[in-house]
Every structure is written in C-alpha cells, then in structure tokens.
C-alpha cells in the first residue's frame, strides 16, 4: 500500500532521496540541512518556506509511519534523518532501480513532468540516454491493472505540449482525467 504523504512530507522524502545520491557524504541530514534542502529556490516546485518546527513535526510523523529513520546523538543532541520509503531498509514495498529512483525523486520535488523535463533535470541523479529511456523507466512504475496503487501515473497530454506528463501518487491518488495545468484559470508561464 502506498503512503499518503502531505505536500511537506513528500518534499522532505524527496530531499532525503536527492541528497542521498548528490551528497552521500552528508547523509544522514541534520534538521538544519533538511530544512535548507526543502526550502531551496532552485530545483523545487513549489518553492517552500518551511520552518524547522514544521520540518521536525513532519519528520516525527514520518518516523511514526516508519518512512524515515531518526538517528539521535544523545551526546550532542543533534538528530539526523534518512528516508526509508524505498531501498534496502524500506518498510514500504517500494523497490526502485537507479533510473526509477531518479524519476520518483524529481516527481516528489517538482511535481508532474514530461519525459523531456525529467531527463533534463535528472543529471545529478541519473543519466538517461534519451526520452524513451525515461518513459520506459516511468512506465515500469505504472500498474494498469490497479492504477490506484501505481507509484506513478501518466497524465493526459496537456494542450500545447508534445508529451504527456508523469506524476507520483505517494501523496494520494491523482486524477488522471485532467492534465496538470489544464485546471480552470491556471496558465503556465
């Protein structure tokens, strides 16, 4: 069963996944480092301005659901965090290869994206040969028989776009009938 993450929880898990690949020597992350990662102005959509209290509260909730591990150093009083959503220490039945890990990370950090956008943004996480490799890796995370349990869904192609977008369902089931950006009054810049 997929977790139903809040927007903040999805961002924090995405940050922990990203930093485990891009800065593995800094893992696990301190509260300050995780807050800074969540509030980055680049490579995030939407940009957030979370306080350390909000991050700490969300991390406690994630730890209760065993989606993160909190390593507490009682001598220094510093807690450090690592994700357990996927990988060897996962408590959720999510096993991802490197390409899929990159895709899920980017979807958690930036929301719905096309294969071209995922490929362009994945450089530090994984190098995709082409957009077809992205689409193949993302499609492997889709379960057509039970779409409500798919980690990823393919959204209909939005008007004016060449490609359909992919979106994660770790924050709840996504309405696959409406392309992202097609909601009333929403216009992309």
For each feature predicted by the language model, list its residue ranges:
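Intrinsically disordered, low-complexity serine/threonine- and proline-rich regulatory segments
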Residues: 1-15, 21, 25, 59-95
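Positively charged, polyanion-binding regions of nucleic-acid-associated proteins
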Residues: 6-28, 94-112, 138-143
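Residues in the recognition helix of alpha-helical DNA-binding motifs
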Residues: 15, 58, 137, 169
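Short acidic, hydrophobic short linear motifs in intrinsically disordered regions
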Residues: 23-47, 112-128
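A short, conserved structural fragment
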Residues: 56-74, 139-158
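Short, amphipathic alpha-helical interaction segments positioned at domain boundaries
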Residues: 77-117, 164-188
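A contiguous pocket-lining binding segment that forms or flanks enzyme active sites
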Residues: 103, 116-155
């Amino acid at each position: 069963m997929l977790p139903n993450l809040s927007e903040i929880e999805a961002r924090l898990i995405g940050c922990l996944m990203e930093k485990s690949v891009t800065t593995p020597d800094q893992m696990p992350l301190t509260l300050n480092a995780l807050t800074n990662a969540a509030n980055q102005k680049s490579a995030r959509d939407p940009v957030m301005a979370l306080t350390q209290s909000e991050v700490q509260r969300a991390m406690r909730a994630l730890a209760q659901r065993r989606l993160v591990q909190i390593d507490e150093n009682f001598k220094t009083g510093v807690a450090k965090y690592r994700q357990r959503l996927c990988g060897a220490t996962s408590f959720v039945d999510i096993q991802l290869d490197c390409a899929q890990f990159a895709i899920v990370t980017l979807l958690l950090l930036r929301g719905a994206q096309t294969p071209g956008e995922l490929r362009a943004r994945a450089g530090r996480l994984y190098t995709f040969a082409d957009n077809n490799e992205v689409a193949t890796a993302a499609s492997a995370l889709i379960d057509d028989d039970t779409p409500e349990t798919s980690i990823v869904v393919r959204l209909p192609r939005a008007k004016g776009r060449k490609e359909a977008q992919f979106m994660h369902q770790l924050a709840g089931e996504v309405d696959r009938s409406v392309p992202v950006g097609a909601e009333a009054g929403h216009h992309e810049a």
